[in-house]
């Protein structure tokens, strides 16, 4: 008899694969990406062991903002985070919660950045990107390290918006703007007026997208 993976018979291999493969569901949600600006300079100047507690403090502030605003952290890696809002289908698609989380991240990280600048002579800030749309919720990874994550074009666009955002800025797409429907002040009181920016062309994507930003209060070259 021909053996399948790991010496299993073909039938047994199929059964094991089916057991391991969790169901995938689709939903509409708002995806948030955030990353640390100035991280490369930090990592170059400081010993690696000194960077660890700084990243832990940074990611802790981001996770607190996500959880406080009703979202869920799906991925942390290095100096960045991916979170989802409205993934469970409660309270709409999560646009207002995601915007509130982005605003909270900027607000809560500001004193941390000031302290790092004072104590370590390091300039740092956060960039945030938001996009609302359909996502697939699934479990990925080897059997010993599986994790629930979000997949799809919505995730890719949110990540690209985060990369495009300037330090201290929240960028979001037209789908987020439409979902807010003028309720942005209720979602995150104290936000400065939104600015509509020129269309953003994403490499590999057929059409550009309309984008808005919550501008940075202070322009930083990071």
Protein language model features and the residues they cover:
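Regulatory cytosolic signal-relay segments
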Residues: 1-27, 192
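Catalytic NTP-binding/metal-coordinating core of nucleotidyl cyclase/transferase enzymes
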Residues: 18-100
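Helical mechanochemical/support elements of P-loop NTPase systems and associated helical scaffolds
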Residues: 51, 58, 77, 94, ...
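Alpha-helical scaffold within the catalytic cores of cyclic-nucleotide enzymes
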Residues: 55-71, 87-128, 153-154, 159-162, ...
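Acidic/histidine metal-binding catalytic segments
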Residues: 77-78, 118-127, 170-176
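A short glycine-enriched loop-to-beta-strand structural element that forms part of the catalytic core
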Residues: 83-84, 122-138
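Short, surface-exposed loop/helix-turn segments at secondary-structure junctions
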Residues: 140-152, 185-193
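Cytosolic regulatory/linker segments at or just downstream of nucleotide-handling modules
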Residues: 164-222
